Amino acid sequence: MRSQWVAKRRGQSNVSQMHYARQGMITEEMDYVAKRENLPPDLIRQEVARGRMIIPANINHLNLEPMAIGIASKCKVNANIGASPNSSNLEEEVAKLNLAVKYGADTVMDLSTGGGDLDTIRTAIINASPVPIGTVPIYQAVESVHGNIEKLTPDDFLHIIEKHAQQGVDYMTIHAGLLIEYLPLVRSRLTGIVSRGGGIIAKWMLHHHKQNPLYTHFDEIIEIFKKYDVSFSLGDSLRPGCTHDASDEAQLSELKTLGQLTRRAWEHDVQVMVEGPGHVPMDQIEFNVKKQMEECSEAPFYVLGPLVTDIAPGYDHITSAIGAAMAGWYGTAMLCYVTPKEHLGLPDAEDVRNGLIAYKIAAHAADIARQRPGARDRDDELSKARYNFDWNRQFELSLDPDRAREYHDETLPADIYKTAEFCSMCGPKFCPMQTKVDADALTELEKFLAEQKNKEAIAH
């Protein structure tokens, strides 16, 4: 779809959506996003120019269907996939991608850490994906030196980052905000550093006693991103790994640096979103969102959860969807899903499904709470279908039609029950929605009540 769009841009020194937006241009991607979001094209351009919205759209990802991440657009959901040293299969990863897209993922991150040819897997995912693909290039950098983190050089990082950009990756998590002087701040934490990328950078700095190479070479990463229109997803290496550690000095120190890096990227017209926690008690979620907006000049916020309690392994798609809905309500632009397998193991297809649906619920609930135009239309349509006992229409409008139909048909599988005025919960005689109050009956009732009121007034 985008071949002709990007052909005229090739060879330019900066091909980012922000660059064109700041020149007053409405690109084809901006126009496409405007139609998807039901927003004016110039509003999209203004938000991208301002940095409050990004359109992750690498010029080499030609089959991408452009989408937006930002406060003015609908709340988005990301799903993670990826091969590991213990589980790696190209066909499986493409199947996971297709499953994620089926259940509503707005973007997908390939977090492959080994076990196969990572370049082949990544390229296959990009070629098959209509949604933006994100990566964490530091994982492949570590794999390239067989896990010997201390052997990595700044050039190794830059080489892998450019390779991902050439392959068509739309956004990359770059852990540039973790400075060496912040490491002592984790001493009082219960769970230390829980970011994989952050842990890698921390280990490198502790070995070499040198500053974070992603920070010292940030301008070189900017130059790579300008050439391909890759968006920064600035990684929160010091995100809290438990509610005890939430909103501590380590987390907030890094956040301040992420804000500085955001503005540095903007000076070169490169798009940025900022990653956030993690594990956060409900009473601290609003503070975390507002603090990010303040420190990062309202760059889109992209949070993992957050989990609001730590005691429910096996149910962390629920503990985190609670926090995600609140974060979305307060202004977070994208939610990274958490599956029931979080903290326990590698998610399978059913885990991906359950995690995604939980997060689509959270994002949609946030859109309703933020009173986005049209956000509740689907809810109203489903409610009408429910009141009219139009079961097939209810299934069709559901976030997970297959699951809704499956649960209904467990007890009433025959087609005749698709028009029945009851389900197995109340049976044929006790469903309250059978009580249809027509307009004439209400008019008669209102007339009666008015007469009663008049009689009482006369009596007094």
From Swiss-Prot:
Keywords: 4Fe-4S, Iron, Iron-sulfur, Lyase, Metal-binding, S-adenosyl-L-methionine, Thiamine biosynthesis, Zinc. [4Fe-4S] cluster binds at C423, C426, C431. InterPro entries: ThiC, ThiC/Bza_core_dom, ThiC/BzaA/B. Binds 1 [4Fe-4S] cluster per subunit. The cluster is coordinated with 3 cysteines and an exchangeable S-adenosyl-L-methionine. Its EC number is 4.1.99.17. Substrate binds at N80, M109, Y139, H175, S195, R196, G197, D236, S237, L238, R239, E275, Y302. The keyword Lyase applies. Zn(2+) binds at H279, H343. It catalyses: 5-amino-1-(5-phospho-beta-D-ribosyl)imidazole + S-adenosyl-L-methionine = 4-amino-2-methyl-5-(phosphooxymethyl)pyrimidine + CO + 5'-deoxyadenosine + formate + L-methionine + 3 H(+). Its cofactor is [4Fe-4S] cluster. It holds the Pfam family ThiC_Rad_SAM. It is an enzyme of class 4 (lyase). One of its GO terms (biological process) is thiamine diphosphate biosynthetic process. Pathway: Cofactor biosynthesis; thiamine diphosphate biosynthesis. One of its GO terms (molecular function) is carbon-carbon lyase activity. GO terms for cellular component: cytosol. Belongs to the ThiC family. PANTHER family: PHOSPHOMETHYLPYRIMIDINE SYNTHASE, CHLOROPLASTIC (PTHR30557:SF1), THIAMINE BIOSYNTHESIS PROTEIN THIC (PTHR30557). Catalyzes the synthesis of the hydroxymethylpyrimidine phosphate (HMP-P) moiety of thiamine from aminoimidazole ribotide (AIR) in a radical S-adenosyl-L-methionine (SAM)-dependent reaction. HAMAP family: ThiC. This is Phosphomethylpyrimidine synthase.
